Amino acid sequence: MEFFCYHRDRRGSVALRDELLEEHWSYMDRYAAEMIARGPTLADDGDTPTGSVHIVDLPDPAAARAFAFDEPNYQAGVYRDVLLRRWRNTLGRTMWDFPEAAPVVTGTWCSAWARARLPTSPCRPTGTS
């Protein structure tokens, strides 16, 4: 069963979000096989995060609720609310069909947003040191 999960950030939670990046990535690593798509939502400036979208293929609604509400950012109060809905992948594609859009390096989820904010992050594009 496919689910759309939209976590919306609380105002002023960017610092806490940054602090929890490694925990968030580790949590998402556990769902790599189930992940259809993921990424941050952004403010009009195209840089400031306002939330996160995850589309996952999970066995049932209980597993989807666990995914959404056990997420470290949700547990720590980064998110103000969660929208969880059934979803249908009518195109039949996933982010894994476009590897340049979803880099995964040595078991750690990375994003351009994270690399820009954490210069000492272990995130590096594939093939670089």
Predicted features and spans:
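Conserved, structured core segments of small domains
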Residues: M1-S129
